[in-house]
């Protein structure tokens, strides 16, 4: 993580924690975030943490070395965006088409509590944050992980295989090299500690459809980056996040282009969207 997202983890009495202790801390964090996950998902989150810890020295995935710190600064940090994103990605809010192509979930099913989006692109996924975490939480959402560093992309593919995440696709390339199409029509594009906001939105221009939600995970609100946005881009919302066990600022920034402004709101009020709201909306967390 960059220096702008430096943090102090609130220390537990023991510096060395086994899987059982990590599971208890994860459960406590999920409760604080008002997230209810099935046991299988919790198990996969812990399995992913084990992979991240095991292969970190080989792939240089993160500067965080201690498993409990990884749990807080990576897993819980990524999980903190699940509820606010799910609230904005229910079927009424992303009905219709993106980039001219119908959205399809991992199994071609409509979005629900475990699939508030049909297609997500995680830009600069690194060690899989937040993309792998979202793939575990949203098993019916197609997740595209974009990571140009070959060894990190190899780790992401290994995670997808070992965690049985068949709905994950890894792109060992720069995001600018991706082209939208029927298999890549994102209704959510996001990044975490990836680049400046101007560089981020510049790279994703070709993938952004009229109703695509664009989000960036940041620590302290980057006022200089916001002021430097061009091309009709602006920050529509700044959502403060509270990550369990972490003494640090976290924010989720939602961005929009002036040309697309109001598109998502209009889709919310579309008769077809209202008709599907009760059936496909996300579960309360």
Each predicted region: which residue ranges?
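Hydrophobic alpha-helical segments of small multi-pass membrane proteins
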Residues: 122-125, 129, 148-151
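Residue-level detector of alpha-helical hydrophobic segments embedded in or interacting with membranes
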Residues: 105-106, 111, 125, 134, ...
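Class I SAM-dependent transferase core
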Residues: 2-114, 151-152, 158-166, 274-279, ...
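Flexible, active-site-adjacent loop/turn segments at secondary-structure boundaries
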Residues: 35, 59-62, 68-69, 73, ...
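Conserved class I S-adenosyl-L-methionine
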Residues: 91-93, 116-126
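S-adenosylmethionine
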Residues: 4, 137-285
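Conserved SAM-binding loop of SAM-dependent methyltransferases across substrates and taxa
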Residues: 127-140
